[in-house]
Amino acid sequence: MFAVMRIDNDDCRSDFRRKMRPKCEFICKYCQRRFTKPYNLMIHERTHKSPEITYSCEVCGKYFKQRDNLRQHRCSQCVWR
């Protein structure tokens, strides 16, 4: 069993949230954005290195810098016929 701790004080609540937030140890060398995982940093840094590489949607013609964004767009926006 475990107990649930109730925090009534606003100062304590914000302090608790700050301590429970994961540390952002991986920093982008281009814009100083912080990440908790090295993989996320690597994906982000690609946007700085190669802006000329784009992926386009065959249905609507929109362009995306990341392949994952195109895949997400296909699933949620465009209707495949």
Curated annotation (Swiss-Prot):
SUPFAM superfamilies: beta-beta-alpha zinc fingers (SSF57667). Changing residue 46 to H: In drm2; foregut proventriculus morphologically and functionally defective. This is Protein drumstick. PROSITE patterns: ZINC_FINGER_C2H2_1 (PS00028), ZINC_FINGER_C2H2_2 (PS50157). Has two temporally distinct modes of expression during early embryogenesis. Expressed in seven stripes at the blastoderm stage, then during gastrulation the seven primary stripes are supplemented by seven secondary stripes which appear in alternate segments. This results in the labelling of each of the 14 segments in the extended germ band. Also expressed in the anterior gut primordium starting at stage 5 and in the embryonic foregut (including the proventriculus) and hindgut. It is found in: Nucleus. GO terms for biological process: digestive tract development; embryonic foregut morphogenesis; embryonic hindgut morphogenesis; embryonic pattern specification; foregut morphogenesis; hindgut morphogenesis; imaginal disc-derived leg joint morphogenesis; negative regulation of DNA-templated transcription. The gene is drm. A zinc finger (C2H2-type) spans 26-48, 55-75. Changing residue 46 to C: In drm6; foregut proventriculus and hindgut morphologically and functionally defective. Abolishes lin binding. Abolishes lin-inhibiting activity. Putative transcription factor. May function redundantly with odd and sob in leg joint formation during the larval stages, acting downstream of Notch activation. Acts in a hierarchy during foregut and hindgut patterning and morphogenesis, antagonizing lin to relieve the repressive effect on bowl. Involved in cell rearrangement during elongation of the embryonic hindgut. Regulates expression of hindgut patterning genes to establish the small intestine region of the embryonic hindgut. Required in the foregut for spatially localized gene expression and morphogenesis of the proventriculus.
